[in-house]
Amino acid sequence: MKMMNETRGVDKSPPNAQYFANAGREYMEKYGAEARDFAEIARVSHAHSANNPYAQFREVYTLEQITNSPMIHAPLTKLQCSPTSDGAGAAVLVSQKFLDARPHLKDHAILIAGQQLMTDSPQLYSRSAMDLVGFDMSKRAAKAAMAEAGITPKDIKVCELHDCFSANELILLDGLGFCEPGKAHEMVRNGDITYGGKGVVVNPSGGLISKGHPLGATGLAQCAELVWQLRGWANNRLVDDVSVALQHNLGLGGAVVVTIYKRADLKKNSRVSDGEVVKKSQFEYNPAVEARGVSAADGDRVRSKVTRNEWAMGDTEQKLQARL
């Protein structure tokens, strides 16, 4: 807050909105982006979430509606800000040995091909509003993760990034290497952040802005979406012919994690029908396109048959069912 106050000043609007709005303003001043570019990012995010059954918001908004929603901190309006959400996620990690012993799982196993955690460097004190929200550390983490995975930004056709505010998505398009430096707003204007464009499809889930921001579970929500994309299960919003995906998640203060996922069979994804998902999985439905509550039977199915402990579970099951 002290650094922000010394550079851009502080007012009574929400502090996080000020941090990221200031970063957006800096990009506008340096490269010529306009307020409409941030609004267009939000429009795309809300459009994407219409096909995500887990999204907190599934309404589709026009650019005018987004621009005319209440101003939070210029240039960001309400519909360009992520909500605080409730949510949970889980991922199962297995060894290569485990997978090799189960070849029937390989066509929907996803490899963590590269992963890097970075923290703020002395660049944080550059008096840049962009670096204050993680631009520099995101750039370094992305470069290192891609090098580890043996890919370049041009190999990535789908990503989930931390769009807590639309301004952060815009600067990250630049920081993650999806465009030439200073050209992120041109990418947005050309339609290159969504289906049918020439760039990467950003946040097919709707992102934090529209899918929601369950804070501690946000990273796993991003992971789940990209796994479903790479498997081909997200058949109502699939980014076709993809074999690699990027995930970006950050927290101020500051740390960022960038992960590169690949299909374990190294093939490109293809659309999988709901019926095929049922055949290939333990689900009775396709969880990528249909959200269902968890039953007691579902819970029992995944609990250990060898080391389960009824005393440790206590009344957890009853409490969960009551909430659901």
Q: Where in this protein do the model-derived segments appear?
A:
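Phosphate/pyrophosphate-binding loops at sites that engage ATP/ADP/AMP, CoA/4′-phosphopantetheine
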Residues: Y27-G32, A141-D155, A234
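Flexible glycine-/small-residue-enriched beta->alpha junction loops
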Residues: M1-Y31
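Short acidic capping loops at alpha-helix termini that bridge into adjacent secondary structure
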Residues: R36-D37, T152-K157, P181
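Condensing-enzyme catalytic core mediating Claisen C-C bond formation in acyl metabolism
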Residues: E40, M71-R140, A144, D192-S205, ...
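Short glycine/threonine-rich loop-to-helix capping motif typified by GTGT followed
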Residues: L124-A129, D163-M187, P214-A217, L252-Y261
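Acyl-CoA/ACP chain-elongation machinery
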Residues: A42-Q56, D120-Y125, F165-I171, G216-L220, ...
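Stable alpha-helical structural segments in soluble proteins, enriched in small hydrophobic residues
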Residues: A90, L99, M137, A141-A149, ...
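Cysteine-centered functional microenvironments
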Residues: T7-P14, A23, I41, H46, ...
